[in-house]
């Protein structure tokens, strides 16, 4: 933040960054509203304000959080998180079974998949095909991520992390895809999709589990409790 854009970033390579100019370029039905939304999101990282993006609607779409499952952020599972002292995950770190990353977090996705006896299928989808499960999105966090996607070094570790696959539930009956973990990275890519206007659809890699979202949330919350993993709050102070 405050640094000049990287020369290889989309904003410096001629990419559209301010939203759609016409209905043909818009995600929904109101290009002017989309330009207003994206300007506000881009600005959040530079000021003292914050906005819950679940309270922001993109006309003609279910974005950002239309059809969400009404689950507060603090009640969502965190399969990548910090181990609580003395918990099972903490003990596995000390035993060398799990490794802490640079942020002091462990990735328990593989352990979770093994516990529920399911496979996570790698799929690449349009970001607009995914639905939010939680009912809170911290605007400042999405703004920070969007700033990196638009202005940061595409080959940096930060950008690579933002583009890592997220875990998604796919309902075997309806085909609906709901996000389990990775809401803020997804929302930043949605914002990028709005910002780039008619430059093409933004896609992301997902790990898809064929289980209805309610069942998968119950299973993953039980797992994170058992493992002793920190959950995250939607409180704007955090």
Question: Model-found features: residue ranges?
Answer:
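Basic- and aromatic-enriched surface patches that contact anionic nucleotides/nucleic acids
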Residues: 2-22, 169-238
